[in-house]
UniProtKB/Swiss-Prot annotation:
Gene name as annotated: Adam15
Modified residues (Phosphotyrosine): 716, 736
Positions marked as site (Cleavage): 289-290
Topology with respect to the bilayer: Single-pass type I membrane protein
Location of the Disintegrin domain: 422-509
Record-given protein name: Disintegrin and metalloproteinase domain-containing protein 15
């Protein structure tokens, strides 16, 4: 096999090497520095890089810095392949903390150590399922996987860094090595397919934590034996980087990224008591992590790597379902292989236990890709053949179940110190200056992101990699992006200016949950009933108190308060029995985690009543350091909870002290801040909000609008009656607008009327009169006027109180003014004498016509 590095693209990172602090020189023997290969060599290669100049050796390229993008052509089994690589910026997202010790024991801390990022990730052109993980720190080392059935390792050649050795993965046999999950296993995380699907759909309605990217902040600790095996400190750093790179590659398909935030090397002596018993070593390491490492270097998981051989076939041990726990999130691993692939696979296995992954079931229920009879799944209980490269579907389902049950809240947080130092488009992480990053062109599926520029496409507001973005548009501020999963979880809402959901915030330790059956611890609500259901399925409940107490006070495989560092079972004190092994009844016949090793039944008598008790011995694997014990925070009595597997007062968790600053109107979250009740203002919940809520305001406005509409409708329905009532209230002023069918009562026809002619057109009256009643049909004939002249005026009633223009009374006989035009001849009398008006001295009585009167004539026309 022959490899040639043809050209490098995007030399954004090329330049002078970054300055680094002086590293310790440990020294060592030649035997310690040289290790014989454990596989059959398949060939060698000479690495050369061609840029814009003639070909250069890799060593010459490293003198000026590493390119951020590489394109490599190589031959594998006489076939030409092209690798497309980018620096893995997620591996070292910031400047990690490097710790070592001087001969006098002084701790040397280099925060923000300028560790050269010499590791790359990528894929092989033309192979969609391929992946590549290479480091070029000093020579080329790494892994090339074309398919689940075909993969190659690249190792350093003996004595020549420029001639890496290629071998097939199938040649890396790790005979007799097994894993040992720790005895401290907490909550079962694997379920049968039927139950898992039922729970899956129920939980997906609440929260989708599976598609969100999780980040494990990792610290690797090298003990003194590991330091002496690699006395060149830079070589130790390179090996650590290579292991972390493979870890990140293994977990990436699960949407979990591994970020190396620190490396501690015990350069002078070990800081804990070492032991070949992995359980004892794990207990010592976790105690040191909790009291020494964690306070000065925040992280999510710590892994100890040692050359010390473990007793038996085990190569590692960890705590089941312990991620984010300050007490149990860690593991111990034996550096059992010269190949970094074997060590990285072992660390990935133990880290998987911390994430809630159980061993893969034997047989075909959890098939692993790879050629028979080799096994290539990371969570296989035994690595009798080759190191695992992938996680099975069972592991995927177990991780999803653990996340949906509230595990791993710390994985959704990203510390500001982890911000990348520069931008690199295509690394699937949004670096400074980028708006999005969907990876390589052939793997980018985001319609909102331009994979060539890592900028949003025109019209897009966000990239679809976050829950706060839909169809390239941002959800508004306040949109629920992460609903709570249990009583200890708090909802998160979109900020309105980002596609990412804020960090997962949960209730603080000691806050009550599950109706008082437990308190929140490390963001989880662990009631005894829920723990039984997680182990034995729906319907499972805590065992009877007598059965529980009897089993856990005996101190054997069926009941105890855990194992001592020496491996023996410890009986529980009567006060602590609720904090020991889980004792359940009912549910399924087979557990969802592990397998039943043995069963024991016994009839107990209490107060004259016989009680049938049944206990089981669960086999969780050799790498599980403790039996299934009750989770911290489980209620064990009034005001008492399990802390450190002992029943202690809940006040020790400090919830009351934290709650005081919320002044009785809120609770504390995991960040130590008050979450105020509705109607109270943060940050201390002292001020009561007086403003009416928007919902109340909207309801009031709606009711007011409805009332207005009802009034308008009633007014329209009764409009006729209302009009009549208004006329009555106004009196006579309304009569001129009243309909003709209802005229106001008027006096009878007057005895005198205005003399008018009988033409076709209406004549002009001598003075304005208001319209009231019809005019007389015919004027009075002149020959009758003399007979009526001496008749007295008839009595009249007063007119309505309307303004009427009247003429002043004349002193002479009343006579209508002559018209402008000559009047026609008087018609023959057609009216009876009684209907004619008589003469008089006064004013003529007003006669109201039936039609509107014409406008009054000008004053000059009234008299001729």
């Amino acid at each position: 096999m022959r490899l040639a590095l043809l050209w490098a693209l995007g030399l954004l990172g090329a330049g002078s090497p970054r300055p680094s602090p002086p590293l310790p020189n440990i020294g060592g023997t030649e035997e310690e520095q040289q290790a014989s290969p454990e596989r059959t060599l398949s060939g060698s290669m000479e690495s050369r890089v061609v840029q814009d100049s003639p070909p250069m050796s890799l060593a010459d390229v490293l003198q000026t810095g590493l390119p951020e993008a590489l394109r490599i052509s190589l031959e594998l089994d006489s076939e030409s392949h092209v690798l497309e690589l980018l620096q893995n910026r997620d591996l070292i997202p910031g400047r990690p903390t490097l710790v070592w010790y001087q001969p006098d024991g002084t701790r040397m801390v280099s925060e923000g150590y300028s560790l050269e990022n010499c590791c790359y990730r990528g894929r092989v052109q033309g192979h969609p399922s391929s992946w590549v993980s290479l480091c070029a720190c000093s020579g080329i080392r790494g892994l090339i996987v074309l398919s689940p059935e075909r993969g190659y390792t690249l190792e350093l050649g003996p004595g020549d860094l420029q001639r890496p050795v290629i071998s097939r993965i199938q040649d890396h046999l790790l005979l007799g090595h097994t894993c040992a999950p720790s005895w401290h296993a907490s909550v079962p995380t694997r379920a049968g397919p039927d139950l898992l699907l039922e729970q899956h759909h129920a939980h997906r309605l609440k929260r989708d934590v599976v598609t969100e990217t999780k980040i494990v902040e990792l610290v690797i600790v090298a003990d003194n034996s590991e330091v002496r095996k690699y006395p060149d400190f830079q070589q130790l750093l390179n090996r650590t980087l290579e292991a972390a790179l493979l870890l990140d590659t293994f977990f990436q398909p699960l949407n979990v990224r591994v970020a190396l935030v620190g490396l501690e090397a015990w350069t002078q002596h070990n800081l804990i008591e070492m032991s070949s018993n992995p359980a004892v070593l794990l207990d010592n390491f976790l105690r040191w992590r909790r009291t020494d490492l964690l306070p000065r270097l925040p992280h999510d998981s710590a892994q100890l790597v040692t050359v010390t051989s473990f007793s038996g076939p085990m190569v590692g041990m960890a705590i089941q379902n312990s991620i984010c726990s300050p007490d149990f999130s860690g593991g111990v691993n034996m550096d059992h292989s010269t190949s970094i692939l074997g060590v990285a696979s072992s660390i990935a296995h133990e880290l998987g236990h911390s994430l809630g992954l159980d061993h893969d079931s034997p047989g075909h229920s959890c098939p692993c890709p790879g050629p028979a009879p080799a096994k290539s799944c990371i969570m296989e209980a035994s690595t009798d053949f080759l190191p695992g490269l992938n996680f099975s579907n069972c592991s995927r389902q177990a991780l999803e179940k653990a996340l949906l049950e509230g595990m791993g809240s710390c994985l959704f947080e990203r510390q500001p110190s982890l911000a990348p130092m520069s931008s690199l488009c295509g690394n699937m992480f949004v670096d400074p200056g980028e708006q999005c990053d969907c990876g390589f062109p052939d793997e980018c599926t985001d319609p909102c992101c331009d994979h060539f520029t890592c900028q949003l496409r025109p019209g897009a507001q966000c990239a679809s990699d976050g829950p706060c973005c839909q169809n390239c548009k941002l959800h508004p501020a306040g949109w629920l992006c992460r609903p709570p999963t249990d009583d200890c979880d708090l909802p998160e809402f979109c900020p309105g200016d980002s596609s990412q959901c804020p960090s997962d915030i949960r209730l603080g330790d000691g806050e009550p949950c599950a109706s008082g059956e437990a308190v929140c611890m490390h963001g989880r609500c662990a009631s005894y009933a829920r723990q039984c259901q997680s182990l034995w399925g729906p319907g499972a409940q805590p065992a009877a108190p007598l059965c529980l107490q009897t089993a856990n006070t005996r101190g054997n495989a069926f009941g105890s308060c855990g194992r001592s560092p020496g491996g023996s079972y410890m009986p529980c004190a009567p006060r602590d029995v609720m904090c020991g092994q889980l004792q359940c009844q009912w549910g399924r016949s087979q557990p969802l985690l592990g397998s039943v090793q043995d069963r024991l039944s016994e009839v107990l008598e209490a107060n004259g009543t016989q009680l049938n008790c049944s206990w089981v011995d669960l086999d969780l694997g050799n790498d599980v350091a403790q039996p299934l014990l009750a989770l911290p925070g489980t209620a064990c009595g009034p005001g008492l909870v399990c802390i450190g597997h002992r029943c202690q007062p809940v006040d020790l968790l400090g919830a009351q002290e934290c709650r005081r600053k919320c002044h009785g109107h809120g609770v504390c979250d995991s960040s130590g801040h008050c979450r105020c009740e509705e109607g109270w203002a943060p940050p201390d919940c002292m001020t009561q909000l007086k403003a009416t809520s928007s919902l109340t305001t909207g309801l009031l406005l709606s009711l007011l609008l409805l009332l207005v509409l009802v009034l308008l409708g009633a007014s329209y329905w009764h409009r006729a009656r209302l009009h009549q009532r208004l006329c009555q209230l106004k009196g006579s002023s309304c009569q001129y607008r009243a309909p003709q069918s209802c005229p106001p009562e008027r006096p009878g026809p007057p005895q005198r009327a205005q003399q008018m002619t009988g033409t076709k057109q209406a004549s002009v009256v001598s003075f304005p009169v208001p319209p009231s009643r019809p005019l007389p049909p015919n004027p009075v004939p002149k020959k009758l006027q003399a007979a009526l002249a001496d008749r007295s005026n008839p009595p009249t009633r007063p007119l309505p109180a309307d303004p009427v223009v009247r003429r002043p009374k004349s002193q002479g006989p009343t006579k209508p003014p002559p018209p402008r035009k000559p009047l026609p001849a008087n018609p023959q009398g057609q009216h009876p004498p009684g209907d004619l008006p008589g003469p008089g001295d006064g004013s003529l009585p007003l006669v109201v016509p039936s039609r509107p009167a014409p406008p009054p004539p000008a004053a000059s026309s009234l008299y001729l």
